[in-house]
């Protein structure tokens, strides 16, 4: 019993520490989406809504507001 409690405490500590280390190194936020990525996501969704659903083999050109064929070289 004592060993399992120690193991759980160790794993919890390692998980929390890893999250803080990642955030300190490159600014990641493991607690969910931050405001900037939510705004980017919403902007992306609005741009895609301009085109609607593009047919297979085409992509949404948000600037033009229409579907365009994918170029394959």
Swiss-Prot record:
Which residues are assigned to the propeptide feature?
Answer: 20-47
Q: Name one GO cellular component term.
A: extracellular region
Localization of this protein: Secreted
Q: Which UniProt keywords apply?
A: Disulfide bond, Neurotoxin, Secreted, Signal, Toxin
UniProt GO molecular function: toxin activity
**Keyword Disulfide bond carried by entry:** yes
Q: Where is the secretion signal located?
A: 1-19
Q: Please state what the annotation says regarding this protein's domains.
A: The cysteine framework is XIV (C-C-C-C).
Q: Which family does it belong to?
A: Belongs to the conotoxin L superfamily.
Q: What is this protein called?
A: Conotoxin Cl14.8
């Amino acid at each position: 019993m004592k060993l399992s409690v120690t193991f759980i405490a160790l794993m919890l500590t390692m998980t929390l520490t890893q999250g803080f280390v990642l955030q300190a190194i490159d600014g990641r936020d493991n607690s969910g989406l931050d405001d900037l990525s939510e705004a980017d996501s919403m902007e992306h969704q609005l741009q895609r809504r301009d085109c609607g659903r593009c047919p297979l083999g085409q992509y949404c050109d948000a600037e033009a507001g229409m579907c365009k064929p994918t170029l394959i070289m």
